[in-house]
Regions:
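Basic- and aromatic-enriched surface patches that contact anionic nucleotides/nucleic acids
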Residues: 3-15, 38-194
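Acidic, carboxylate-rich catalytic segments that either coordinate divalent cations
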Residues: 1-24, 28-32
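A short, surface-exposed helix-loop junction/capping segment
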Residues: 31-39
Length: 194
């Protein structure tokens, strides 16, 4: 049995940083080392209107919740903020067009409506990329931890950040709970050992 109280007190290091969108989403090494869709996370569910509203919030400089990561060696896993992370990524890659219905303050500006990131003026692209986002990174203080401890820490962080903030659907909670049952752990361990 994993003693989370001891682990969080003695083994976990928590670091809060402020990172530019540029450093998180245009750095190929960082992108390749970031898993933003771990198995316990729900799928990407934001429609284009909601995604546009979120991007508009960034342009307006409003405070957005931090992205929560778990770091192991040089790899990162998004524990909380998958919808935000993937929306920014899709926008920067040019896969998201800003919809007028999602632009509550910038909707009257022809500089934004119907455009993807690559179609924006250089001024707006630079402004977006320089925007700072808070990140919280959890990691183990040393290399002496088990896979069971790592999985327990990730589940605990995920459950705490998702308890009441943006309620998950019951099937999403069931999925997260299923991933910690003994049978699933057994298969995960044995498949990884092969």
């Amino acid at each position: 049995m994993v003693d989370l109280k001891v682990i969080f007190k003695e083994k976990i290091f928590i670091e809060t940083k402020v990172k530019s969108i540029d450093s998180l989403f245009l750095n190929e090494d960082r992108l390749e080392s970031t898993n933003y869709h771990p198995t316990y996370q729900r799928n990407y569910v934001w429609d284009e209107e909601k995604a546009t509203y979120f991007i508009e919030s960034i342009f307006l400089g409003t405070e957005i919740p931090p992205l929560i990561f778990f770091q192991k060696d040089l790899s990162f896993e998004v524990i909380d903020g998958r919808q935000r992370y993937e929306t920014i990524l899709r926008f920067v890659k040019g896969e998201l067009r800003l919809r007028k219905s999602g632009l509550h303050k910038l909707g009257s500006l022809k500089d934004f409506v119907g455009k993807n990131f690559k179609e924006l003026s250089e001024k707006y692209r630079d402004m977006f990329l320089r925007t700072k986002i808070r990140t919280i990174v959890f990691s183990f203080r040393s290399e002496h931890f088990t896979q069971e401890e790592e999985d327990a820490v990730k589940r605990e962080i995920f459950q705490r950040y998702n308890s009441g903030i943006t309620p998950l659907k019951s099937v999403e909670i069931d999925k997260a709970m299923y991933l910690k049952d003994g049978l699933n752990t057994y298969f995960k361990k044995n498949l990884n050992d092969d």
